[in-house]
């Protein structure tokens, strides 16, 4: 027996659902949204209600502090069963696993039952999860949640005052994250929210419900921390769950945290991922997670079951050195258009920034592209469904699309990577740079391996099953033959045929695709 464990926000709070159904006018909701809300009376998992509105979700989910005290609470009953030995396998995300390890290291009540073996899939994401769990994040969603909580308790003036105070910050955080705006850009937008939160805390903090009071205290502490910018922490930005920006603070060295929590548990663990190593070298991952000198570690690399040499072609043309922005995007769009014609659409273009994606999107639209064009924005699920159901379509994407989406079959028969995905030079990288004697040493030990791992993740969008066929095009002049990162690119990817000739791209597609594929592309 197995169970999927999620965070509280994924489950229904019976008490909050009851209050929501009493307060809402169901006749004013669309049939699908109404049925989704009513269906929660019969199941606990919010993710099962496909058409549940985002607002309804926030109103009925289990709060961070659950104090309903109901013996019949479905969530509490579920947690009791999970804590028993009823399930032989429990599946959770990295954050819950780390939270459990932190609890155990501090002598607190564990969040997960005792286990005999841990299998950690997608383990390459562990360092980022640790940065969040061992640090602090501030998101737009947290600010909005507090405003709604104040309204729900009828403190309308406080809610409206806070909403006005955080408005500029929310607008800044709503911009798609691409790492170009440093943490310092956002700090001035926190001063007014800080004053307002302090005022609300003084005036009504003691009369709020326990849950809302805790939200207020936590937000006040977070905003204060980000305004102070303590020297013993690193402050940076990252992408939130909705594609916007969140503010982050973390400790400089995560390796000690790993050793004191997760690795101190004397039990067998299997860390698995398709992108843990570059070739057969796990050095970068072990260094980031504090396993570099751990004698218990054993390594294994399994060959891919996919026939890349037969089903994949790598196109890396020789391009001129990067020109001015306008000229560069003109040339890039021209190259992408030629590739789309050679492959008859069916393409995914993975960008490293939203600005580059927007520039190419604008130029492709001006050309009256012959293929349906989609851009992955905030409504990612809806857009990916449309793309999958539109034969011959072209999807422009960035961010989570590098590793978070699955497009099997002919849907992605052309994968275009305009720029090599080097890590963004943020405060985290600046701190890490201090550990190396020269910039070159830092580049070779950290920057290039991280680029290679991200490139492998992006490349993984091309071939998803043993019968998939795809052309992968890397349009970064630094990746071309005999250029600076040519050998690094080859070391990151499986052995596949390589060409600089666009005609060979077209010939490859003609040779591996059925007739119906070309009818789709022409539709």
Summary of predicted features, one role per range:
Residues 1, 270-274, 345-352, 356, ...:
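Conserved RecA-like ASCE P-loop NTPase motor core of nucleic-acid helicases/translocases
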Residues 1-90, 95, 370, 430:
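A substrate-engagement module of RecA-like helicase motors
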Residues 64-88, 101-109, 202-318, 324-328, ...:
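A contiguous, basic/glycine-rich beta-loop/short-helix subdomain that forms a polymer-engagement track
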Residues 70-195, 274-289:
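Signature of the SF2 helicase/ATPase Hel1-core->accessory helical subdomain module
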Residues 260, 317-352:
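Conserved interdomain hinge at the start of the Helicase C-terminal
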Residues 317-327, 379-480:
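Conserved RecA-like P-loop NTPase helicase motor core
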Residues 352-377:
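Conserved helicase motor "Helicase C" RecA-like lobe of SF1/SF2 P-loop NTPases
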Residues 473-523:
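N-terminal targeting/trafficking signals and adjacent low-complexity tails
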